[in-house]
């Protein structure tokens, strides 16, 4: 029996070396884009249109769309709100279409679109995501959004958590050092995750802008079974 591959790409800059058009690609940007996207669907958003540039987001705004947009953590002046999961309240997003542009996450989503299916992953939907991947029995590639093409810890830790769950199914295997390393990192951190996360660079960036109130929430596991999936130009739930 040929095992399905579980691979982890720790930076978008490395994606061309991992690209697999037959794989399910899971995009994760734990702090904060993927957590915000999952939260938006938990709170009833109809669809999210991820765009790579602020120019695209602004053009949608001029057409009357609600826009969430940030760069370096800060809300852009034309946007309705930014990138915190707490921005995506039921009162604000239920039944709506939202255009979304972020520093790292939305570009990673577009990059991943060459895969057979693109899913959005966060701790909030971790087990549901792992169960779906095991059910589908396809190769899986976890794409970490990172920070401006650089490695980051928080996304890699999540990749390890997801990979470990998927590999519990003996139809899957991995000889990918990105996978093995991310699992080792996750297991080193898991007993004191918040203590570990307090060291990461993004924690400092968020604290600098008084945006660190979401860090604990973004590491809560299994608050939902919803899995956002990319369908051409927009995200909806499976």
Go through the PLM ranges and name each one.
Residues 1-4, 8-21, 26-30:
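Non-transmembrane, aqueous-exposed alpha-helical and coiled segments at domain scale
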Residues 6-7, 23-26, 46-49, 64-68, ...:
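Structural motif
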Residues 8-16, 33-45, 51, 55-98, ...:
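Residues that scaffold, gate, or flank divalent-cation-dependent active/transport sites
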Residues 80-117, 131, 153-238:
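Long, charged alpha-helical interface segments
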Residues 102-103, 122, 144-146:
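Short, structured patches in soluble enzyme cores that scaffold and shape functional sites
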Residues 132-140:
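Glycine-rich phosphate/diphosphate-binding loops that line cofactor/substrate pockets in enzymes
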Residues 140-147, 170, 174:
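Glycine-rich anion-binding loop/nest that anchors nucleotide
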Residues 145-155:
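Phosphate/ribose-phosphate-bearing ligand recognition and processing surfaces
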């Amino acid at each position: 029996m040929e095992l399905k591959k579980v691979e982890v790409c720790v930076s978008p800059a490395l994606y061309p070396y991992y690209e697999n058009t037959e794989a399910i690609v899971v995009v994760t940007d734990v702090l904060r884009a993927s957590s915000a996207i999952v939260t938006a669907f938990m709170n009833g958003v109809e669809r999210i249109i991820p765009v790579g540039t602020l120019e695209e987001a602004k053009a949608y705004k001029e057409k009357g769309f609600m826009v969430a947009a940030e760069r370096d953590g800060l809300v852009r002046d034309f946007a309705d709100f930014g990138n915190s999961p707490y921005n995506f309240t039921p009162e604000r997003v239920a039944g709506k279409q939202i255009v979304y542009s972020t520093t790292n996450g939305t570009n990673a989503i577009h990059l991943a679109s060459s895969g057979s299916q693109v899913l959005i992953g966060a701790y909030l939907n971790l087990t549901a995501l792992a169960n779906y991947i095991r059910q589908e029995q396809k190769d899986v590639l976890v794409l970490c959004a990172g920070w401006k093409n650089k490695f980051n810890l928080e996304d890699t830790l999540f990749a390890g958590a997801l990979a470990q769950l998927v590999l519990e199914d003996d139809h899957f295997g991995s000889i990918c050092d990105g996978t093995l390393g991310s699992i080792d990192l996750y297991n080193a951190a898991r007993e004191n995750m918040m203590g570990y996360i307090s060291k990461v660079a993004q924690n400092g960036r968020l604290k600098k802008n008084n945006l660190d109130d979401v860090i604990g929430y973004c590491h809560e596991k299994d608050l939902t079974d919803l899995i956002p999936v990319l369908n051409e130009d927009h995200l909806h739930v499976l």
